[in-house]
């Protein structure tokens, strides 16, 4: 007979739990280290201080709420590591949205399964990963994206997905530009 082991050890500790959310702890760190580097992305040639990162996170969180995201809604991100990933992660925490991290190597059937399985309301996508074009894959699953003039998706195969946010400098039919959502008033 095998012995059952706990996946987490727990008990009393000298280190108390913090009575704050991740978003609150983030804001505390931003206030304490405002002018210090918070995020450096060498491959994107981007360097943000805590204050700059906080401004972008707050703007993106506000934009998510303006798009109709509510506490407990799911927002997926399908992208390799980048600055936008970090902004999305902290903005989701602050807006009360559950972030769903997708494997950047997913193919169409895997993407469709996961987005439906967890009822994702939104999807943040990069342009591509290696030789995989994310927009092409998404358009094959949800051809309605090309007709979503008001940027609210109603796709037969992805019924829960309403918003696609593209990490890109160009405007795309049916998609929000990530950069545009960083300029929202906080």
Regions picked out by a protein language model, each given a short descriptive name:
Residues 95-180:
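Structural core segment of the AMP-binding/adenylate-forming
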Residues 18, 35-82, 86-90, 107-112, ...:
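Conserved AMP-binding/adenylate-forming core of the ANL superfamily
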Residues 26, 88, 138:
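Aromatic/hydrophobic pocket-lining residues that form π-stacking "cages" and hydrophobic walls in ligand
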Residues 2, 25-49, 170-173:
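AMP-dependent adenylate-forming
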Residues 1-20:
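Flexible, non-catalytic linker and terminal segments flanking ANL/adenylate-forming cores
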């Amino acid at each position: 007979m095998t012995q059952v082991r706990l996946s987490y050890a727990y008990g009393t500790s000298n280190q108390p739990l913090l009575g704050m959310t991740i978003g609150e702890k983030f804001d505390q760190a931003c206030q304490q280290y405002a002018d210090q580097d918070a995020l450096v992305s060498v491959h994107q040639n981007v360097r943000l201080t805590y204050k700059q990162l906080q401004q972008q996170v707050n703007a993106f969180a506000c934009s998510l709420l303006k798009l109709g995201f509510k506490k407990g809604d799911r927002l997926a991100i399908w992208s390799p590591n980048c600055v936008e990933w970090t902004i999305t992660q902290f903005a989701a925490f602050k807006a009360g949205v559950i972030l769903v991290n997708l494997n950047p190597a997913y193919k169409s059937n895997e993407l469709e399964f996961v987005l439906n399985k967890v009822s994702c309301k939104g999807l943040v996508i990069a342009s591509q990963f290696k030789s995989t074009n994310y927009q092409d894959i998404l358009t094959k699953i949800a051809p309605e994206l090309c007709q979503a003039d008001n940027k609210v998706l109603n796709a037969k195969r992805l019924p829960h997905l309403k918003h696609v946010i593209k990490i890109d400098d160009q405007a795309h039919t049916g998609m929000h530009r990530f950069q545009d959502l960083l300029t929202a008033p906080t």
